[in-house]
Swiss-Prot record:
Keyword Membrane set for record: yes
SMART domains the UniProt entry points to: cNMP
Extracellular-facing ranges: 124-136, 212-224, 287-391
GO cellular component, one term: plasma membrane
Name assigned to this protein: Probable cyclic nucleotide-gated ion channel 5
Residues the record lists as binding a nucleoside 3',5'-cyclic phosphate: 498-628
Principal location: membrane
Protein keywords: Calmodulin-binding, cAMP, cAMP-binding, Cell membrane, cGMP, cGMP-binding, Ion channel, Ion transport, Ligand-gated ion channel, Membrane, Nucleotide-binding, Transmembrane, Transmembrane helix, Transport
Complex and partners: Homotetramer or heterotetramer.
Cytoplasmic side: 1-102, 158-190, 246-265, 413-717
Keyword Acetylation assigned: no
SUPFAM superfamilies named among the record's database cross-references: cAMP-binding domain-like, Voltage-gated potassium channels
Organism in which the protein naturally occurs: Arabidopsis thaliana
Length: 717
């Protein structure tokens, strides 16, 4: 039999050293079998050949897959990605979220840096020629190159970022595709072209070519190339920023962590648009000035248009033009705001030419002036612009008005949304307070009740700021709720002496079931004789506890409750009693708040559950602690001590009276007839003392009538 058993071989008992591809082959093609494991009669040689066949077959399938170009499609859950050997990033990983935020910032910086290339052309006021600011060209090219490095890093990161398989989005987050080939294919089909066009260093190439050639004829070509290239590259850059921001919101849940950050973000975008508009206005002003100079040069006859660009002073005929250029250009291309009939209508660019910023070498002054012009006209939708009949100028003005309208609406709408989120709770409180006032007025509540309602609403607002803490905590997982409750309540619960010596498991169960309560001044928490439905543990404030022993005449007991004490101890006795029914115990005291009180409440159902689940509450130590801090037990103990003390005083006085009577009788010893008189005097004195203390004895008996509180069923140590 043993030999026959050795001939049985299971498929799943094959060598565990098989590669993962063969295991995947077995799993993928398991449906080809009948679904049940049958014994296979084979020898050891047959089993070894079977192993080799599976290995070769799986390798063959993999090679066929590579030759067909399909790749190996693999998907894992996010938690499995952490133990993967491949460096593939989870799209919701904190590091990747930080990199995406950094990339958004780099995109915004690139959009901010690119308009600096529009400030490169500048007019030389002395030579009356158009040149390029070399220092600014080097600075702008360096900044653009540095920012493009972030683009390249982001492109490399996209090739290592997993994505969620569309077919696995039925439930939960879905499975992550970690196959590098699939990730690269998806990126190449979606965003690679846009990223590639955005990162091309075309402005740097144009600037570096000009800096190396330094020919005057290259100024015009450089100016036109920069205008065209920056405009063209703005399209893919904007197309990349907006989806990336949306993806960041979808992945992280929010784009800005605080409302002020969100408002500042949209304000920054509005200022960025003003910066772009100002740079365009500066460059287009130079274009109009260049067009005027070319017309004046052609009309002069002794001028070549190459003379208008710096670096061409060595050309033939420049000396003749140099003598006449001042008068020709000033008469033909004069820009004056006060001139109602100018020789050349510069339109909206007159302000730039008359202010002299196109010829200023101070970049800070030039930039601030253009930024202010862009911000002013975006905010006013270009209402103060007086355009000429030049088509490009009119198109620029129309674009400015439309862009200003859209951006201003976005700015106001988003800033209002973000800033309203700061005061939404306050507004809700105002609405609730208004509704409460209208309701109290409609129901004609007395003034004292209205004041109590207002005081409670105000105190609750100051404590919670309108946030429903219980609702927030209830939506969290159980272990997270336990940790939060432990963090919030454990230190306060340990201040209650009844819970100070309990173990952590019992304290966690109590903290999970505690509910915060607020009571304003002069609020009655419970009245004597009412059912006790919750046990309160005081955290802050002062309370007054009064009892009349069920309304008995002549009996009044008053005590103060402070931080760390509790009330409603009748409920604990009821919860610990296994024979207690569904009827709640009656309160033996009236508890009133003397100040604003914060407390934790433990309801009857929750206390009964804790008492039934945790035997620690039945220990002798808890019994002694409960008796020591219970005001009901303290009242009983005080009455018991008073009754014992009065009995002691009575007995002592009677003994003193008898001693005095005996002394009198011994001092008056004489004839025999005086013995009977002394006996009668002693008897009369005893009767007198007995009569004097009769009323006092009645009071003592009434005091002792206060019943001892029922003891709970402490069945375990």
């Amino acid at each position: 039999m043993a030999g026959k058993r050795e001939n049985f071989v299971r498929v799943d008992d094959l060598d565990s050293r098989l590669p993962s591809s063969s295991v995947a082959f077995q799993q993928n093609y398991a449906s080809n079998f009948s679904g049940q494991l049958h014994p296979i009669h084979a020898s050891n040689e047959t089993s070894r050949s079977f192993k080799k066949g599976i290995q070769k077959g799986s390798k063959g399938l993999k090679s066929i897959g590579r030759s067909l170009g399909f790749g190996v499609y693999r998907a894992v859950f996010p938690e499995d990605l952490k133990v993967s050997e491949k460096k593939i990033f989870d799209p919701q990983d904190k590091f990747l979220l930080y990199c995406n935020k950094l990339f958004v910032a780099s995109c915004i910086l690139s959009v901010f840096v690119d308009p600096f290339f529009f400030y490169l052309p500048v007019i030389n006021a002395e030579s009356k020629c158009l040149g390029i600011d070399r220092k600014l060209a080097i600075t702008a090219s360096t900044l653009r190159t540095f920012i493009d490095v972030f683009y390249l890093a982001h492109m490399a990161l996209q090739l290592r970022t997993a994505y969620i398989a569309p077919s696995s989005r039925v439930f939960g987050r879905g499975e992550l595709v970690i196959d590098p080939a699939q990730i690269a294919k998806r990126y190449l089909q979606r965003w690679f072209i846009i990223d590639f066009l955005s990162v091309l260093p075309l402005p740097q190439i144009v600037v570096w070519r000009f800096l190396q050639s330094s020919n005057g004829s290259d100024v015009l070509a450089t100016k036109q190339a920069l205008l065209f290239i920056v405009l063209v590259q703005y399209i893919p850059r904007f197309l990349r920023v907006l989806p990336l921001t949306s993806e960041l919101k979808r992945t992280a849940g929010v784009f800005a962590e605080t409302a002020w950050a969100g408002a500042a973000y949209y304000l920054l975008l509005y200022m960025l648009a003003s910066h772009i508009v100002g740079a365009f206005w500066y460059l287009l002003a130079l274009e109009r000035n260049d067009a005027c100079w070319q017309e004046a040069c052609i009309d002069a006859g002794n001028c070549s248009t190459d003379f208008l660009y710096c670096g061409n002073q060595n050309m033939d005929g420049y000396a003749v033009w140099n003598r006449a250029k001042e008068s020709v250009l000033k008469s033909k291309c004069r820009a004056d705001l006060d001139d109602n009939n100018p020789p050349f209508d510069f339109g909206i660019y007159t302000q730039a030419l008359s202010s002299g910023i196109v010829s200023s070498q101070n970049f800070i002054v030039k930039y601030c002036y253009c930024l202010w012009w862009g911000l002013q006209n975006l905010s006013t939708l270009g209402q103060g612009l007086e355009t000429s009949t030049y088509p490009m100028e009119i198109i620029f003005s129309i674009s400015l008005a439309i862009s200003g309208l859209i951006l201003f609406a976005l700015l106001i709408g988003n800033m209002q949304t973000y800033l309203q989120s700061l005061t939404i709770r306050l507004e809700e409180m105002r609405v609730k307070r208004r509704d409460s006032e209208q309701w109290m007025h409609h129901r004609m509540l007395p003034q004292d009740l209205r004041e109590r309602v207002r005081r409670y609403d105000q105190y609750k607002w100051l404590e919670t700021r309108g946030v429903d803490e219980e609702y927030l905590v209830q939506n969290l997982p159980k272990d997270l709720r336990r940790d939060i409750k432990r963090h919030l309540c454990l230190a306060l619960v340990r201040r209650v002496p009844l819970f100070k010596s309990m173990d952590d498991k019992l304290l966690d169960a109590i903290c999970m079931r505690l509910k915060p309560c607020l009571f304003t001044e002069s609020t009655y928490l419970v009245r004597e004789g009412d059912p006790v439905d919750e046990m309160l543990f005081i955290i802050r404030g002062r309370l007054e506890s009064v009892t009349t022993d069920g309304g008995r005449s002549g009996f009044f007991n008053r005590s103060l409750l402070k931080e760390g004490e509790f009330c409603g101890e009748e409920l604990l006795t009821w919860a610990l009693d296994p024979k207690s029914g569904v009827n709640l115990p009656s309160s033996t005291r009236t508890v009133k708040a003397l100040t604003e009180v914060e407390a934790f409440a433990l309801t009857s159902e929750e206390l009964k559950f804790v008492a039934s689940q945790f035997r620690r509450l039945h220990s002798r130590q808890v019994q002694h602690t409960f008796r020591f801090y219970s005001h009901q037990w303290r009242t009983w103990a005080a009455c018991f001590i008073q009754a014992a003390w009065r009995r002691y005083c009575k007995r002592k006085k009677m003994e003193e009276a008898e001693a005095e009577a005996a002394a009198v009788s011994s001092s008056t010893a004489g004839p025999s007839y005086s013995i009977g008189a002394a006996f009668l005097a002693t008897k009369f004195a005893a009767n007198a003392l007995r009569t004097i203390h009769r009323n006092r004895n009645t009071k003592i008996r009434d005091l002792v009538k206060l019943q001892k509180p029922p003891e709970p069923d402490f069945t375990a140590d």
